[in-house]
Amino acid sequence: MIIHFTLNGAPQELTVNPGENVQKLLFNMGMHSVRNSDDGFGFAGSDAIIFNGNIVNASLLIAAQLEKADIRTAESLGKWNELSLVQQAMVDVGVVQSGYNDPAAALIITDLLDRIAAPTREEIDDALSGLFSRDAGWQQYYQVIELAVARKNNPQATIDIAPTFRDDLEVIGKHYPKTDAAKMVQAKPCYVEDRVTADACVIKMLRSPHAHALITHLDVSKAEALPGVVHVITHLNCPDIYYTPGGQSAPEPSPLDRRMFGKKMRHVGDRVAAVVAESEEIALEALKLIDVEYEVLKPVMSIDEAMAEDAPVVHDEPVVYVAGAPDTLEDDNSHAAQRGEHMIINFPIGSRPRKNIAASIHGHIGDMDKGFADADVIIERTYNSTQAQQCPTETHICFTRMDGDRLVIHASTQVPWHLRRQVARLVGMKQHKVHVIKERVGGGFGSKQDILLEEVCAWATCVTGRPVLFRYTREEEFIANTSRHVAKVTVKLGAKKDGRLTAVKMDFRANTGPYGNHSLTVPCNGPALSLPLYPCDNVDFQVTTYYSNICPNGAYQGYGAPKGNFAITMALAELAEQLQIDQLEIIERNRVHEGQELKILGAIGEGKAPTSVPSAASCALEEILRQGREMIQWSSPKPQNGDWHIGRGVAIIMQKSGIPDIDQANCMIKLESDGTFIVHSGGADIGTGLDTVVTKLAAEVLHCPPQDVHVISGDTDHALFDKGAYASSGTCFSGNAARLAAENLREKILFHGAQMLGEPVADVQLATPGVVRGKKGEVSFGDIAHKGETGTGFGSLVGTGSYITPDFAFPYGANFAEVAVNTRTGEIRLDKFYALLDCGTPVNPELALGQIYGATLRAIGHSMSEEIIYDAEGHPLTRDLRSYGAPKIGDIPRDFRAVLVPSDDKVGPFGAKSISEIGVNGAAPAIATAIHDACGIWLREWHFTPEKILTALEKI
C-alpha cells in the first residue's frame, strides 16, 4: 500500500504494509523520539506524536491510518543545535534524568501551551496523564511549565529552581545544566536501540511456562529449518560455565548458580531456547516450532514454604566451593541430583542449598541477655513486604557485533566493567578482545546492575558472526528481570520506660527467587542501613535468604534498606505507643548523632568485614527533624472530617556512598592543545547526572569553565576501571577519582606554567578562566599544552586518579507524611509528603532535587499501589504496566516537597555524599505510622490497600 502524509511539515510517500505499527514505522524513519516502552499498549506515552492536531500514542495506530494525516514528532521542536522554549525549560529545571521519554514530554507540554496560555495544575495533570516517568517524580514538571510560560513573555525570565550552596566554591553547589540533557530531550541518537544496524539479527526467547520443572525432551530442528533462522541456543549447545547474573566486584559474594541455559526450570519465564533470526517476525514464528516436554515439579513460592522440612529443593545440584568448603559438603553432595549441572560458591556465605538457603549471616555486639534483662518493656513484631518491580522506562536491551576479531557490546548497563569481565569469561575471550560501550541508560534503579541478556546476545554474535539485537518486552521485564526481594523481618526491642533502647534484635528473612544474585548483600543491607540509625549497646541480627520459584530478584534501588527501615521504624513506633511517647520524641531519644560510632557495622560486611568501626562523620538529622517538624506542623490539631481521619507519620533514613575496602574507581584527564579538557571516567552515568558531577569537580579543581570539560564515560576502551553505578557510589567513588585526577593534572600544569613564567611553583596558582597566574604575569592552559606538544616539548599533560577508601560517608534524611484515611471505604489519600535529605554538599542542587522526587515517588508507589502477584502455580499475574500500579502524575501528593539540608563530609569530594538512592528508604514507614495516627491501626505488611485498612478496622 502507498500512503501519503505530512511528517514534521515535509510531505511523505511510502510503500507500507497497511497493518504496520506506526511507532515502528516512524522510528525506522529516523524519528527516535517515538519509542516503545510498553509493548504497544499506549500506557507509557514514550511513543507520543501529534496526529492531526491531537496527542496520540503511535503504537495504537497502523500505517493505513496515516493516509493524508499530518504528523508531528518531538523532532519538530527547536532546531538541530537549538532547543525549543519547552526543551530549554526542561534542561534548566533539571527534570531530564534518564531522558527516555522526555522528548514525548516536551511534545506534550508544547501542545498544552499552544492550546492554553497558562494552564492550571489540573490541566497540566490531564495533559501529562498519559505519560509514564519512573525517574523524575513529576513535581519539577510544574516548574518547567511555570518557566516556559514566563519566558513566552520574557525570554530572559527566571524562576526559583533550586537553592545554591558553598559560596566559597565556583561551580560546586551551583546551577549547571546536565551535560547530556539537551541531546536526550531532542531525541538525538544515544540509546542502544539507536545504534542497531539494518543487518542485525534479532533474538527471541522461549521461556518456561512452569515455575518449577525439568526439561525431559527438547527438539529445535523444525525451528532451525525455518528460512531466516540463523541459530538456536539451548542447554545442549551453550557454554558449560556457571556464573551469577549479579554485577558485583570479583570474587562475587553470590552463588554462581546460573548456566546460560539449563535443564531445570526454576521460574515462569526461565530460559528454554533463544532463536536468532533475520527478523523479529521470523524469530517469533520459530518459537512456535520448538518442541518441549516437561516434568512439572511442585513450586516453592514463599519463605515459609522454602523453610518447610519437606520443601522441594530449588537448587538440588552438587555444590563446588572455591575456598572455605564446609565439613558437610561431601554428605550434602551425595544427596544431590546428578544432571551434569553444579553450583559454584566463591567463599563461605552461609549457603545451604539443600535447605533452600542461598545465603545467611549472623552478627551481634554487646550482651543481648543483659540488654533485654535491663529493659522495662519488651516488644516483638513481624513485618512483611512484597515483590516490587523497577519498571525502567527503557526495557533491557543489548546490541552486539564483531569488529574484526573483537566483540563489541552496546549495552544499557550500570556496570560496563563487570559486564566485560563476565561476558569475556562466558564466551571464552580475553578481556582486551571485548569492548563494552555503555550507551545512555533509560532507567536502571538497580535492575541493570545484573547481566540478564547481554551474555546471550554476545554468545549469539560469537557463534554466528552476525550483529544481534536482544530486547526485552515489557512482559519479560516482569518475568525475567530481577525485582525487589520479598522480606519477612522480625524485630525485638527492649527499652526503658523513657523509651531509650537497651537491646535490639532483627531477624531478616528474604525470598531471592530462583537464583542467588545479591542474595547475601541485599538482605544484609536491611540491618546494615537501619540498625545504625538507632545506636544501641546490645544488638543482634540474623539474615537468611531463601531460594524459591517466584520470578527473579536482585538489586533494586535501596538494596534491602527499605525493608529493614520499615521494620525498625514501625517497631519503634509501636514501642512508643505502648510507652505513651510521641513517635518523633522516641526517635529523638534514640537516633544517631554526628560523630557517633556505629558499632554494629563492625559486624556487617558485603563479602568481608569492615577494617574499622564506621562513624557518622557528618549527620544533619537534628536540623532535618527540626525543619520537618515545622513544615508538617507535627503538633497541630488533626481535625476529623466525617469518615476522613487525618494522621501524621515520620521515618528517618540513611544510605551509604559506595562500598569501602571493596570497590574502586579510576579516572584520567587530558589537557587539550587549546586549553580544554577531556575526562576519561570509568563511571557509569545512568541518568543520575554523574557525568555532570565529574565535569563540575574537574572544573572546580582546574579553575576552568565547566563548558571546557568533556567527559567520556562508561566505555571500556576509552576509560579506566570503575566498579559501576551501584551502592550509591557515583559521587564519592567516581567523583573522588575525578577530583584526584584533576589535582594530579593541576600539579603538572602548575609546574610547567611556572617554568614558562620563570617563577617558582610556590609563587603561581591556577585561576579562572584557565590560566596559571604568577607575580610576573600569566600563561593560558592552551599555551602550556601547545608548548608541551611541540618537537622540543614535554609531551601531553595527563592526570590520573585512583580512589579507594576504608571510610564510609552516610547520607541521612527524614520523610514526613500526612494522610487522610476514610474509615468507611478504606481509601488512603496522601495529602502531604516532605522528603528532607542530607547529601553533604549538593554538587548539582536542581538535579539532586530531581533525584529525591523520583526516588520518593517510587517509594510511595511501593507503599501504596505496587506489587507483583502470582497464582498458586507460580504464574505471575502482573505482566505489564497497566496492571502493575506504578504512579503517574495524578498520583503524587498534592503537597510534595524535597529539601536539601547540607552538611560537610570529609570523605566525599568537596563535602558531597550520595543522593539518588536514599530517597526510596522511608516512604513506607512514614505512611504506615501516619495511617496509625489517623485511625489507630498497625499495617505490618506493605503495600497498603483499602482492603487491608478495612480488615484492620474489623469492617470486613
Curated annotation (Swiss-Prot):
It is an enzyme of class 1 (oxidoreductase). Keywords: 2Fe-2S, Iron, Iron-sulfur, Metal-binding, Molybdenum, Oxidoreductase, Purine metabolism, Purine salvage. Its cofactor is [2Fe-2S] cluster; Mo-molybdopterin. SMART domains: Ald_Xan_dh_C. GO terms for biological process: purine nucleobase metabolic process; purine ribonucleoside salvage. Binds 2 [2Fe-2S] centers. Mo-molybdopterin binds at residues 414, 445, 727. Gene3D superfamilies: [2Fe-2S]-binding domain, Aldehyde oxidase/xanthine dehydrogenase, a/b hammerhead, Aldehyde oxidase/xanthine dehydrogenase, molybdopterin binding domain. SUPFAM superfamilies: CO dehydrogenase ISP C-domain like, CO dehydrogenase molybdoprotein N-domain-like, Molybdenum cofactor-binding domain. Probably has no xanthine dehydrogenase activity; however deletion results in increased adenine sensitivity, suggesting that this protein contributes to the conversion of adenine to guanine nucleotides during purine salvage. Belongs to the xanthine dehydrogenase family. This is Probable hypoxanthine oxidase XdhD. The gene is xdhD.
